[in-house]
């Protein structure tokens, strides 16, 4: 179904710093969803994504979902929840590393084209060709000419994808500077998330307004009627995930696919001609759990 383009001018969360605007974050003071309600609704939406997957697989639909936003905005967390129960043969994540020297000598979009879905597939881009409009522009990884060319070519490129039948959805996760900094500090001392904190993340703290200007310019040129940007307020992660997931599902006219009835065959009778090898001939892992129970 057709969804009107979001007016990005209302997304104040991602513009001037909170110090300049006189507030800290959009999250404090807002009523937050309870964990029980969140978990129940998350599972319901995940069930719908399984239905969407099966519809795509049977209908041959091709879906591309782009996740963009500042570092620490919650893109990866949303992708993780969407794909938790999906078939990796149908739905996959494209998270490309920095381009190689060879890729730098290609047409800019070429390395992304290789990851586009075939018939019946879903691809979630954890960052995408929009790197050129963000980090590459701000950090000087592309020339001014390459940047201008990107802004001119991208609407044409996306129109080509859509004309060929690809369902393209683009989401910008909008986080306040105060909340981004809080998340970075939390990662700093978290042994399982510290790897997420890169030198580029730290640099983005000091270049907040540069990234804001780059984002605004990107929206002006690439938020088109056929390929709009949808802005997700993401200071509250759980709200952002549910809002984004529900919205994405609402933009696609998918349908339930009749499931084949599965009948398990009866297990054959033991013939008596097979004997399991003695246990001591195999190398078993230690019963680590037993040590926990004994404590």
From Swiss-Prot:
GO cellular component, one term: plasma membrane
Record EC number: 2.7.4.-
Example GO BP: GTP biosynthetic process
Catalytic activity: [phosphate](n) + GTP = [phosphate](n+1) + GDP
InterPro entries for the chain: P-loop_NTPase, Polyphosphate_phosphotransfera, PPK2-related, PPK2_PA0141
Post-translational modification: Autophosphorylated at His-115 and His-247 using polyP as a phosphate donor.
Region (Disordered): 1-28
Key words, A-Z: Kinase, Phosphoprotein, Transferase
Keyword Phosphoprotein: yes
Modified residues (Phosphohistidine): 115, 247
Pfam short name (any one): PPK2
Bias-annotated ranges (Polar residues): 7-16
GO terms assigned for molecular function: GTP binding; polyphosphate kinase activity
Family: Belongs to the polyphosphate kinase 2 (PPK2) family. Class I subfamily.
Stored PANTHER family: ADP-POLYPHOSPHATE PHOSPHOTRANSFERASE, POLYPHOSPHATE:AMP PHOSPHOTRANSFERASE-RELATED
Assembly, per entry: Interacts with Ndk.
NCBIfam families the UniProt entry points to: PPK2_P_aer
Main function: Uses inorganic polyphosphate (polyP) as a donor to convert GDP to GTP. In addition, modulates nucleotide triphosphate synthesis catalyzed by the nucleoside diphosphate kinase (Ndk) in favor of GTP production over CTP or UTP. Plays an important role in survival of M.tuberculosis in macrophages.
The protein's name: GDP-polyphosphate phosphotransferase
Native organism: Mycobacterium tuberculosis (strain ATCC 25618 / H37Rv)
Lineage, broadest ranks: Bacteria, Bacillati, Actinomycetota, Actinomycetes, Mycobacteriales
Gene: ppk2
């Amino acid at each position: 179904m057709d969804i009107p383009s979001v007016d990005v001018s209302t997304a104040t969360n991602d513009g001037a710093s909170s110090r300049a605007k006189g507030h800290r974050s959009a999250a404090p003071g807002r009523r937050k969803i309870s964990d029980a309600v969140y978990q129940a609704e998350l599972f319901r939406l995940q069930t719908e994504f399984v239905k969407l997957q099966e519809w795509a697989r049977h209908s041959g639909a091709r879906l591309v979902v782009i996740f963009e936003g500042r570092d620490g905005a919650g893109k990866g967390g949303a992708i993780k929840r969407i794909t938790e129960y999906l078939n990796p043969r149908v739905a996959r994540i494209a998270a490309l590393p920095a381009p190689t020297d060879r890729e730098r000598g290609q047409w800019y979009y070429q390395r992304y084209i290789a990851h586009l879905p075939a018939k019946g597939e879903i691809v979630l881009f954890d960052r995408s060709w929009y790197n050129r409009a963000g980090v590459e522009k701000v950090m000087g990884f592309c020339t001014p000419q390459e940047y201008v060319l990107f802004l001119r070519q991208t609407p044409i490129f996306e129109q080509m994808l859509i004309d060929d039948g690809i369902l393209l959805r683009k989401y910008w996760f909008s986080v306040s500077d105060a909340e981004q900094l809080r998340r970075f500090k939390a990662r700093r001392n978290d042994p399982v998330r510290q790897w997420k904190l890169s030198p580029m993340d730290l640099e983005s703290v000091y270049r907040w307004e540069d990234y804001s200007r780059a984002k605004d310019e990107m929206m002006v040129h690439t938020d088109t009627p056929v390929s709009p940007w949808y802005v997700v307020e993401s200071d509250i992660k759980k709200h952002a995930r549910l809002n984004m997931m529900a919205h994405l599902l609402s933009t696609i006219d998918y349908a339930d696919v009749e499931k084949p009835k599965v009948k398990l065959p009866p297990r054959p009778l033991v013939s008596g001609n097979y004997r399991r090898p003695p246990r001591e001939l195999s190398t078993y892992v230690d019963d680590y759990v037993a040590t926990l129970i004994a404590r």
